[in-house]
Structure formats: C-alpha cells, structure tokens
C-alpha cells in the first residue's frame, strides 16, 4: 500500500486545518520544500500536496513551490486545490506532477472531469470530500447536495485513474478515518481509492491495508504533531 505524507500550503507555509476550516489552522515552522525533503530522506516515494491558496482563488498560487519540490526530489506527487481549468492541469503536468486532483470543479461540472480524463490519460485523480454522505465543494465551504455514491456512479466510467476520498468530519481531527464509508466508496469505484482524513496511528495504516480496492492512505496532522514517527510509518510501505 502507498503512503502519502501530506503538505498543505497556505501563504507559502505548511499548515493543517481542522475539518477544512480556514479559521482553525495550525502553522508549522518548516517550509514546504524542507518538509518534502524530510519525507524523501526517510524513504517515502509519494507525496500529497494541497494548495490551499488555490482552493480559495482557483489559481495555481503555489506553483513555484511545487515546481521546486518536483525538481529537488524524486517523488511521485499528486496535487490538488482549486484546479478548475485545463490550463491549470497543464501547468502542473508540465511541472512534473504525477497526478492532478480535481475536486469541486469536477463535482460542479462533470463534463470538465470527462474532458480532463480524456486529454490527460492516467494523470487525473478525482477528489471527493464528503460530510455526512454529501459532497462538499469550494474549499469545503459549500454542500453540493449530491450524495457521494450517487455522484461516483455517474462519473465512474470517465477515466479517472485514482480516487481520493476525504471524510471532512475526520480531517485534521486524528480520530481515525471513516473506514466504513471509505469501504462503501471503494466497493463502487472503478479506480483505486486513497483514504484521507483523521489518520491518528500506525494501527490506522494497518487497518487500511486489509481493505479491498484501497491503493493508499494520506497522513498529515499526525506526522506534524509527532503522533506518528516517520521512522515507524516508513516501515508500513510496501516492499
């Protein structure tokens, strides 16, 4: 199973939000580039980056930082946060990003998702962020009134190569992921699923390994707060 240490960027800093609330954030001293280097030095191969400025503006605000990370470290990087145009996808792919995550824009406009998947085969990940079974959009500030599983069934054949499922009620809480709902999503999804939101311990990683159609798991706040040591986490990587 793949493990994706997370870097969320806001105002050029590493931050973590609680339940997606921009008013409830923790800033960390280490820079995004140095944090990526730390992950690389510990032996991680994958990295999950969210441009929180981009999530608010719809622009590739932190593209230069992401480019620097790509060029300095040999990591497979997935990037999300406010990607709302083919132009933005191209910028990230040209920068060397492995997969671009489409969230709100895909939920609001299914044709955009379909076009992106056709234009960039194997490069598009679908990011579904849900609260109480319903998808949220626009930096988690709006409820889309769309049931997660209903939406997934509609777009399942569009060609996304990865699905990142986040339970907003768990994100940043370290209360463990919503394994039950993630399992429901994985059972419906045509593509492999990444678990996100609430990882608190190595036990969560071990539990995720036993689930069907789960490709990997994203770990964020538990690393920054020292609840999970990178030395322990890297042992859970597939050989």
UniProtKB/Swiss-Prot annotation:
EC class of the enzyme, as a word: isomerase
Gene3D superfamilies for this protein: Aldolase class I
Catalytic activity: 1-(5-phospho-beta-D-ribosyl)-5-[(5-phospho-beta-D-ribosylamino)methylideneamino]imidazole-4-carboxamide = 5-[(5-phospho-1-deoxy-D-ribulos-1-ylimino)methylamino]-1-(5-phospho-beta-D-ribosyl)imidazole-4-carboxamide
Major localisation: cytoplasm
Localization terms from the record: Cytoplasm
Involved pathway(s): Amino-acid biosynthesis; L-histidine biosynthesis; L-histidine from 5-phospho-alpha-D-ribose 1-diphosphate: step 4/9
EC number: 5.3.1.16
Source organism of this protein record: Pelagibacter ubique (strain HTCC1062)
Record keywords: Amino-acid biosynthesis, Cytoplasm, Histidine biosynthesis, Isomerase
GO biological process: L-histidine biosynthetic process; L-tryptophan biosynthetic process
A Pfam family of this chain: His_biosynth
Any single Gene Ontology cellular-component annotation: cytoplasm
Keyword Disulfide bond carried by entry: no
Recorded family membership: Belongs to the HisA/HisF family.
Signal peptide: none
MF (Gene Ontology): 1-(5-phosphoribosyl)-5-[(5-phosphoribosylamino)methylideneamino]imidazole-4-carboxamide isomerase activity
Superkingdom of the organism of origin: Bacteria
Record has Cell wall biogenesis/degradation as a keyword: no
Residue positions of the active site: 8 (proton acceptor), 129 (proton donor)
Protein name: 1-(5-phosphoribosyl)-5-[(5-phosphoribosylamino)methylideneamino] imidazole-4-carboxamide isomerase
